[in-house]
UniProtKB/Swiss-Prot annotation:
Biological classification of the source: Bacteria, Pseudomonadati, Pseudomonadota, Gammaproteobacteria, Enterobacterales
Family named by the database record: Belongs to the complex I subunit 2 family.
Organism: Buchnera aphidicola subsp. Cinara cedri (strain Cc)
Protein name per Swiss-Prot or TrEMBL: NADH-quinone oxidoreductase subunit N
Biological function: NDH-1 shuttles electrons from NADH, via FMN and iron-sulfur (Fe-S) centers, to quinones in the respiratory chain. The immediate electron acceptor for the enzyme in this species is believed to be ubiquinone. Couples the redox reaction to proton translocation (for every two electrons transferred, four hydrogen ions are translocated across the cytoplasmic membrane), and thus conserves the redox energy in a proton gradient.
Subcellular location: Cell membrane
Length: 481
């Protein structure tokens, strides 16, 4: 009984989310099913966050053949749950507009969240693949939930086909690794490489590792495997993008870190090392430079996210043998990226729903123009978020990139530092372009501004102001981390 209790403690947040899914089945025919579903989902996610924060102080490590939970896992699970929480809160107004299928959105979010948490705590290729499929299949429904656009449907179908192909590559890589090592549990690989170091140079092992990395880079939309990503960002609803743009990155990046930790000898294979290095560099350059020619704001953010993921990959690849999980540098930059995207798409979803209600769908691309003039608070919050993402001086984003440059110089990556700095200047121009549009006088039709009297709930205001407050305080005091 004690053993069973000890096994349940670490996975209790997942069990809590599963229980909330069961409750949702009982309120499918409720008259206020959207409100009830939102309450059930947000409460379960909120208490999962509280539980993890509480147990994090006493619980250190739990390991079995299928899962491994440590302080590193707790950090990523909290980020994933926060992303899900914001998605549920800011999707509520959109779901009220749906006639028939509305509460199903919460099913998708909960299932994807459970899948993401399985990826984060996976210690076996079986649990990893189960988590990946559980994460990505419901996301297809999330992306298409608030849109009937053919372009959106086409981009999702394209993403689905390519995602299936990347999952097949992952399985192919796993099969080659299993053929060479005879193991699927990650915990055994450091021992195998320690006692049989020559196995890492086996051609089938190298091919298997390359296939797995290729699959992960596709799911992270790194260059040149990014072609599906901009269309998803452009045609999907901002409310869906709160979850998609953050949850996928958190989950897959957490596994990539764990994978590189259990396969430390990858750095000895120069070909793989240089390929990862070039992919990260080209991602930073490509995302910033191609963003210049974009006219759609969401598509621009999609390209800039490629650049940000490239930054995170550079942090990892330049640490080589001294790689340490969750150092201050990685925490700061990941925090900026995740909360920046959550804040941006949360504000965008509030604005866009007013266009839907006023039947101004054709004008949604101009929804950020003049935001400051009809809602100064949202305009200022959006400016703070975008300035932080750009790395503007005296913001949290500036310190994140400053620490990256300092780290690269210490590792003697001088040319890399110079190239990234030049690329970052271009990226800053892209963010300033969006910020500039916030302060342009809003367009008027029939003497009426595009959006007047934005409705924002008290909870939504609190969450957005909290993000802005965190960015400002941590911008002045970055060493709080």
């Amino acid at each position: 009984m004690i053993r069973l209790f000890n096994d349940i403690i670490p996975i209790f947040p997942i069990l809590m989310l599963i229980f909330s899914i069961i409750i949702l089945f009982f309120i499918l025919n409720n008259k206020n099913k959207v409100k009830s579903g939102c309450i059930v989902t947000t409460i379960s996610i909120f208490f999962s966050i509280i539980y993890i924060l509480y147990i994090k102080r006493f619980f250190f490590n739990y390991s079995s053949d299928l899962i491994r939970i440590d302080q590193y896992s707790f950090y990523f699970m909290i980020l994933l749950l926060i992303s899900s929480f914001f998605t549920c809160i800011f999707s509520y107004s959109w779901l009220l507009l749906e006639d028939n299928y509305s509460i199903e959105f919460y099913f998708f979010v909960l299932l994807s969240t459970i899948g993401g948490m399985l990826i984060i705590i996976s210690n076996h290729f079986l649990s990893l693949f189960l988590g990946i499929e559980l994460l990505f299949l419901p996301i297809l429904g999330i992306l298409n939930f608030f849109s009937n656009s053919r372009k959106n449907l086409f981009s999702i179908v394209n993403y689905m086909i390519l995602s299936v192909f990347s999952s097949a590559l992952l399985l192919l890589g796993v099969s080659f690794i299993y053929f060479v090592s005879g193991r699927l549990s990650f915990s055994f690989f450091p021992l195998i490489f320690m006692y049989y170091p020559s196995i890492i140079l086996n051609s089938m092992m190298i091919f298997g590792i390359c296939m797995i990395l290729l699959s992960l880079f596709f799911k992270l939309s790194l260059f040149p495997l990014h072609t599906w990503s901009p269309n998803i960002y452009q045609y999907s609803n901002p409310c869906s993008l709160i979850f998609f743009s953050t949850a996928v990155k958190i989950s897959i990046f957490s596994f990539l870190l764990r994978f590189l930790n259990f396969f430390p000898y990858i750095y000895k294979i120069k070909s793989i090392y240089y390929i990862i290095y070039l992919i990260s560099m080209f991602s930073v350059f490509f995302g910033n430079i191609i963003g210049i020619i974009q006219n759609n704001v969401q598509r621009l953010i999609g390209y800039l996210s490629i650049s940000n993921i490239g930054f995170l990959l550079i942090i990892i690849i330049t640490q080589s043998y001294s790689f340490v999980f969750l150092n201050k540098l990685f925490i700061i930059y990941l925090f900026i990226y995740i909360f920046g995207l959550i804040g941006f798409f949360s504000i965008k979803s509030i604005i866009d729903i007013n266009f839907i209600e006023r039947k101004n769908n054709l004008l949604k691309e101009n929804s950020l123009i003049g935001l400051f003039w009809y809602n100064p608070i949202l305009g200022i919050l959006m400016s703070i978020i975008l300035l932080s993402l750009s790395g503007f001086p005296i913001t949290l984003g500036f310190w994140g990139k400053f620490f990256i440059f300092k780290h690269l110089i210490q590792k003697k990556f001088f040319i890399t530092t110079l190239l990234i700095m030049l690329s970052n200047i271009v990226g800053m121009q892209n963010y300033l372009y969006i910020i500039r549009s916030l302060y342009i006088k809003p367009i008027k039709f029939s003497n009426t501004s595009l959006v007047n009297n934005l409705y924002i709930s008290i909870l939504q205001k609190f969450l957005l102001i909290s993000i802005g407050f965190l960015f400002v305080i941590l911008g002045f005091f970055p060493y709080i981390f």
